[in-house]
Amino acid sequence: MALHIHEACILLLVIPGLVTSAAISHEDYPADEGDQISSNDNLIFDDYRGKGCVDDSGFVYKLGERFFPGHSNCPCVCALDGPVCDQPECPKIHPKCTKVEHNGCCPECKEVKNFCEYHGKNYKILEEFKPSPCEWCRCEPSNEVHCVVADCAVPECVNPVYEPEQCCPVCKNGPNCFAGTTIIPAGIEVKVDECNICHCHNGDWWKPAQCSKRECQGKQTV
């Protein structure tokens, strides 16, 4: 007949001078003989139900004691019916987090996005760039790109042109206006035909030219 471990302890206690009663206490979580669980004739395991809790490493905890069952588990309290574990209120994960680890009770952000993505390209935080001649953009700390479009002045001509790498249109021939279908320069009087002399309104290039009729040689004045 196999000798139980706790029976051996009891025999030792009755031998004077060898083992005192202080050698085994309630701190050692003794299990009753009837609570021992045997998987075969050679192995005997103590059953701690109602007396304590055991973690993944085999450590025993008292009733009411707080402990972590495993590395990735949340804290638990040892109760009569076994560990009672509650999920704590975990910190919020950063919305720009690109790498989250779940090795502990709460998920933990290990890497936060530190760049901006704009039209398929990545830019560093606070980096300024020009995606087009008319745009000035910057990568903000919020990982968002803010852009400003150039505020171009109204050209003082009716035929502005766009030069390469320039955002705003320019008047290559200076200010002008329309005299009928003819473009005339501003600031001077221009004879547009045999009978009409025209000039642009000062500063009002979008208005049609002001024209005056003169006597025409060989033609009747309209």
Curated annotation (Swiss-Prot):
Transmembrane segments: none annotated. GO terms for cellular component: AMPA glutamate receptor complex; extracellular space; synapse. It comes from the Eukaryota. The keyword Secreted applies. InterPro entries: VWC2/VWC2L, VWF_dom. Pfam families: VWC2L_1st, VWC2L_2nd, VWC2L_C. It is found in: Secreted; Synapse. Its main location: secreted. The keyword Signal applies. Residues 1-21 form the signal peptide. This is von Willebrand factor C domain-containing protein 2-like. Peripherally associated with AMPAR complex. AMPAR complex consists of an inner core made of 4 pore-forming GluA/GRIA proteins (GRIA1, GRIA2, GRIA3 and GRIA4) and 4 major auxiliary subunits arranged in a twofold symmetry. One of the two pairs of distinct binding sites is occupied either by CNIH2, CNIH3 or CACNG2, CACNG3. The other harbors CACNG2, CACNG3, CACNG4, CACNG8 or GSG1L. This inner core of AMPAR complex is complemented by outer core constituents binding directly to the GluA/GRIA proteins at sites distinct from the interaction sites of the inner core constituents. GO terms for biological process: negative regulation of BMP signaling pathway; positive regulation of neuron differentiation. It comes from Homo sapiens. Keywords: Developmental protein, Repeat, Secreted, Signal, Synapse. May play a role in neurogenesis. May play a role in bone differentiation and matrix mineralization. Residues 51-110, 114-172 form the VWFC domain. SUPFAM superfamilies: FnI-like domain.
